[in-house]
């Protein structure tokens, strides 16, 4: 997800209260690292659902909430918190939001209450929308001629964080328990807040707009822009299928004949992340005018992958994972990589279409695109948990297939 260089609330005008600071190479790396670390708050729980649900005694149908609520919180934060960049001094807003996020992660680590845990991860997800405050800040520190490149470099950390979040969380949980991951995340987020307070310039909005007007403008764009509607809906549906798989895969891998421990799940997640290599290919396809063909190919690849995943994990077509465990694992890994590739393709081309729209509204359009995207992911995660409780791995694969098939049909008819 590579947002524009503008605030997701709107294209804002700001000024430095301090002397201007340039986005140097080391500072770019720092911003990318910060974004990558923060986004881990949203995706790490996908491979921890089994451990969390057992520890907090979550019913099987509610296991997916641990993965769903951070993403839902992020979407809420995009709508309610990020527009504050147009009203409040940016550095103070960023630092305070990150400190609050660290506090919520600490609560998630310490609490024995499943209700309080779920509330804490939801609020931590909302605070993680600070990512969309950091990106325009970084862009404003770059020369205008290099702004797009600067944003791309910073946001490369986002995809890296998403890809590494699942294996990192699994490795930490496998070594010292799932609570340690949330504790470590809380400490790192707090340290980031301190460093950002030192590194960021003070930036005040030049033309602050009333908060209700900002929120209403988001609704107007969502209601009136068909390109946004089409691409956001497609991204949300694809992310729903993707999240359904990753939310439940750890529950399946701990069962026979796989019987993976947390370290095994971490290696699986790392291998499955190989599909992200298609990112530059998708971008080039869009530049050559192959958007629709590439999107349909990506969605079709995901549908085939979900069938293969059903064969390997649920015995569709009479396949026996017990008789062919190595082949079953290989099919699951290949399917995971194909799902990653499909999501990245849809997201890259959808983002490209959004950024070709009205430049004056680009920030808001990007914010809405990302927000709808995460609502889709949260929905897939929630439905995955219910499907697992009702029909096991077959149910999960069906949920993922339905989400992806709807995206495929949407691209066929529009």
Residue ranges and their predicted role:
Residues 93-106, 186, 293-308, 401:
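Structural signature of the two symmetry-related core transmembrane helices
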Residues 76-114:
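Conserved MFS/SLC helix-loop-helix module at the cytosolic interface between two early adjacent transmembrane helices
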Residues 293-346:
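C-terminal transmembrane helical hairpin of 12-TM major facilitator-type secondary transporters
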Residues 130-142, 344-358:
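Intracellular juxtamembrane helix-capping segments at the cytosolic ends
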Residues 146, 153-200:
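Helix-loop-helix hairpin linking two adjacent transmembrane segments in secondary transporters
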Residues 12-22, 200-232:
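Juxtamembrane intracellular "pre-TM" segments in multi-pass secondary transporters
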Residues 78-89, 277-291, 388:
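Helix-to-loop junctions at the C-terminal end of transmembrane segments
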Residues 121-157:
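Cytoplasmic helix-loop-helix junction between adjacent transmembrane helices
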């Amino acid at each position: 997800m590579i947002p524009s260089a503008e605030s997701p609330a709107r294209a804002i005008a700001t000024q430095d209260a301090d002397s201007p600071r340039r986005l140097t190479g080391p500072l770019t790396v720092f911003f990318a690292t910060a974004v990558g670390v923060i986004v881990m708050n949203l995706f790490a729980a996908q491979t921890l659902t089994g451990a969390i649900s057992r520890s907090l005694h979550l019913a099987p149908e509610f296991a997916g909430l641990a993965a769903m609520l951070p993403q839902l919180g992020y979407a809420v934060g995009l709508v309610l918190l990020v527009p504050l960049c147009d009203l409040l001094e940016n550095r103070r807003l960023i630092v305070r939001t990150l400190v609050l996020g660290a506090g919520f992660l600490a609560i998630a680590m310490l609490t024995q209450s499943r209700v309080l845990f779920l509330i804490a991860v939801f609020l931590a997800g909302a605070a993680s929308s600070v990512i969309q405050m950091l990106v325009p800040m970084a862009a404003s520190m770059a020369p205008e001629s290099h702004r797009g490149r600067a944003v791309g470099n910073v946001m490369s950390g986002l995809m890296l964080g998403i890809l590494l979040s699942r294996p990192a969380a699994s490795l930490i949980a496998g070594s010292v328990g799932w609570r340690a991951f949330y504790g470590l995340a809380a400490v790192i987020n707090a340290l980031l807040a301190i460093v950002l307070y030192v590194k960021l310039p003070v930036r005040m909005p030049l033309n602050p707009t009333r908060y209700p007007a900002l929120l209403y403008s988001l609704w107007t764009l969502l209601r009136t822009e068909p390109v946004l509607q089409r691409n956001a809906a497609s991204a949300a549906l694809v992310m729903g299928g993707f999240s359904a798989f990753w939310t439940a895969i750890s529950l399946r891998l701990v069962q026979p004949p796989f019987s993976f421990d947390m370290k095994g799940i971490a290696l699986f997640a790392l291998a499955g992340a190989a599909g992200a290599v298609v990112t530059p290919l998708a971008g080039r396809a869009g530049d050559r005018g192959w958007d629709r063909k590439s999107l349909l190919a990506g969605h079709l690849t995901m549908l085939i992958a979900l069938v293969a995943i059903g064969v390997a994990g649920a015995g569709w077509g009479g396949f026996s994972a017990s008789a062919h465990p190595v082949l079953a694992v290989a099919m699951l890994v290949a399917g995971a990589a194909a799902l990653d590739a499909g999501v990245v393709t849809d997201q890259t081309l959808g983002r490209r279409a959004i950024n070709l729209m009205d430049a004056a509204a680009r920030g808001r359009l990007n914010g809405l695109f990302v927000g709808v995207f995460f609502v889709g992911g949260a929905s897939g995660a929630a439905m995955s948990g219910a499907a697992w409780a009702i029909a096991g791995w077959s149910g999960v694969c069906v949920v993922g297939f339905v989400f992806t098939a709807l995206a495929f049909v949407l691209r066929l008819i529009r």
